[in-house]
Amino acid sequence: MIPSYVPPKYKVEVDPNRCMLCERCTIECSWGVYRREGDRIISYSNRCGACHRCVVMCPRDAITIKENAISWRSHPLWDVDARVDIYNQAKTGCILLSGMGNAKEHPIYFDKIVLDACQVTNPSIDPLREPMELRTYIGKKPKQLEFEFVEEEIDGKKIKKAKLKTKIAPNLKLDTPIMIAHMSYGALSLNAHLSFAKAVKECGTFMGTGEGGLPKALYPYADHIITQVASGRFGVNEEYLMKGSAIEIKIGQGAKPGIGGHLPGEKVTAEISATRMIPEGSDAISPAPHHDIYSIEDLAQLVRSLKEATRWKKPVFVKIAAVHNAPAIAVGIATSDADAVVIDGYKGGTGAAPKVFRDHVGIPIEMAIAAVDQRLREEGLRNEISIIASGGIRCSADVFKAIALGADAVYIGTAAMVALGCRVCGRCYTGLCAWGIATQRPELVKRLDPEVGARRVANLIKAWTHEIKELLGAAGINSIESLRGNRDRLRGVGLNEKELEVLGIKAAGE
């Protein structure tokens, strides 16, 4: 066996003066960090991923987890991450997997954008005393409305009434511009999905199925679910397409642009096998491209095929990763008869991605939103398609800024998981999530109570919604529609001229 030259990333300490040997830590840890030996608890720090399950559950607060303060020899080129990756690949000969989004110290542009507020000459609006409209419609909007007048006889009198002549495309109605992103059944547990489904139903918004199909337990919430068609076509049939309120074609993902999804066979249980329509225990590997899409014309054919299969009653979205030519791709999507384009930034999370893709491929979501919105406006197509932004949305201010940059709504994924208890340890792909979120092991899944999870996620969405109303009021705006693409209300701090140009905003003080 080839030895590992990588020291433990974290140091686990159990205070013997506080520990009462209840062995709760040995039960709660799914990684095998703890073992009792006589009258003490032994910890194996090399197995710890800092998921904090043991820390939270310890009744005596006896456990401490710290980053292992090892003094690596400093070098301007060969940083610690580069050396650790080489050690691991020299040991395994494999592609390194990771979870979550880009972990490099690239700029987070949301943090370099500040918001405007009204003062004196342009008074603010008090959302506690005046109505604020956050309702959002996702789908095609007509350029103009045409009416025709028809005569109706009422009480013996002929009266002319205006009747809408323009045909309105199907739209999704959101009570808040926050949706829960596509995370598949298989990558996440059924209890995690039930938590999300109950929460979005309560909040009047939507969640995505991911590419893992729709388990029957979620059928009661289908009115608040967006189904997904990915390159693997897992679980896709007419019943699946008809169940959801909309359909999303997944072309790319922000955490791993250019490649397909991967669900390890150990996560493919009998239930997931039935839902995905694949053999139990087999790896679910999606192809990198859709093998029936090699051009915008091919994409248009799939969009129309899905609309025809659902009797033209459901909007169809197309999801792409935020890449260099995203604006040109978005124009093509807008002309393909799709109703919305979903742009996923490189900070977007994932259950499993090659580390080299996660950390080096794609562009920031902030740049992609602004560039796509501007290009669609220049082409006269902005009303033809909605923009949904995802990938690195952490708080209500990020939602507000994303919409001001040009999005209609946002998806949140990691934030929703954190609400359930996720510690962002990045080891989702192992299937050993101690919080019952990214696992299929029954003894771990049952740790997540769907009722409690739903309450936590709904509380998060409601809290963000209240904060967005407050921010709108401070900006003197009473409708989320008036914020969309309103980049005049944004200013940049510490950005160069080119960055400001791409974002379409001015520097602070201008």
UniProtKB/Swiss-Prot annotation:
EC primary class: oxidoreductase
Residues that hold [4Fe-4S] cluster 2 according to the record: 29, 48, 51, 54
Reaction catalyzed: 2 L-glutamate + NADP(+) = L-glutamine + 2-oxoglutarate + NADPH + H(+)
GO biological process: glutamate biosynthetic process
Top-level taxon: Archaea
SUPFAM superfamilies for this protein: 4Fe-4S ferredoxins, FMN-linked oxidoreductases
Protein's name according to its UniProt entry: Archaeal glutamate synthase [NADPH]
Native organism: Methanocaldococcus jannaschii (strain ATCC 43067 / DSM 2661 / JAL-1 / JCM 10045 / NBRC 100440) (Methanococcus jannaschii)
